[in-house]
């Protein structure tokens, strides 16, 4: 079977039924998040290491191997099929979207359509120099990814000219956004934040900030 969202979903569904799909999915997210965040964020490094080791103890070698395989497939999807909200799609296909919190993940084709209406203005600003793009309720990063995809299609090198500052109150959502913005190669600061009170619970830079 080729590399695809469906393949990742099936791998997650094939795990032992000791835990629900939502718990398995978000533990996979955490395993990737801890690994990426620890490459370029010193604050909280040891805590993330401890949490990663806790995941190993919780799930064991078989499930952790599945996590590694799914992670590798996600990387390949970004490299070979381009930018997309892959984690949002996997999240939806597993049926673990959180209706109780009123969460809604925008379909990626709509995110790109919205980006198309704004991209000319973004490109004009880029002609003047580096720019910052903000999203205070970013979810899995779908709208931001849509804009990056459109910029890339138009031949714009956003990696050295665009800084994203995004946040979400939901810790799982911002971790999804952080992973995908990392894989998209963009400079980003991602915050677990209450946009109303301005309280910040965590803040992390992506690897792309090293090039910005």
Language model features by range: what are they?
Residues 2-155:
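Class I S-adenosyl-L-methionine
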Residues 210-212:
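Terminal (typically C-terminal) long, contiguous, charged/leucine-rich segments with helical propensity
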Residues 108-208:
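Conserved S-adenosyl-L-methionine
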């Amino acid at each position: 079977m080729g590399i695809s969202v469906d393949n990742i979903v099936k791998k997650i569904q094939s795990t032992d039924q000791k835990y629900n799909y939502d718990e398995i999915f978000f533990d996979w997210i955490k395993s990737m998040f801890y690994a990426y965040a620890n490459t370029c964020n010193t604050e909280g490094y040891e805590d993330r290491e401890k949490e990663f080791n806790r995941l190993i103890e919780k799930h064991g070698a078989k499930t952790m191997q599945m996590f590694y395989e799914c992670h590798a497939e996600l990387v390949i999807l970004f490299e070979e099929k381009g930018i997309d909200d892959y984690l949002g799609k996997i999240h939806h296909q597993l049926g673990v979207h959180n209706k109780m919190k009123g969460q809604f993940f925008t379909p990626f084709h709509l995110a790109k359509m919205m980006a198309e209406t704004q991209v000319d203005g973004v490109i004009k600003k880029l002609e003047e120099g580096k720019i910052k793009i903000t999203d205070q309720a970013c979810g899995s990063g779908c709208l931001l990814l849509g804009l990056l995809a459109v910029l890339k299609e138009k031949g714009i090198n956003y990696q050295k000219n665009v800084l994203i500052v995004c946040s979400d109150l939901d810790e799982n959502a911002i971790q999804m956004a952080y992973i995908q913005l990392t894989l998209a190669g963009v400079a980003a600061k991602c915050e677990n934040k209450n946009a109303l009170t301005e309280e910040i619970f965590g803040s992390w830079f992506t690897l792309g900030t090293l090039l910005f």
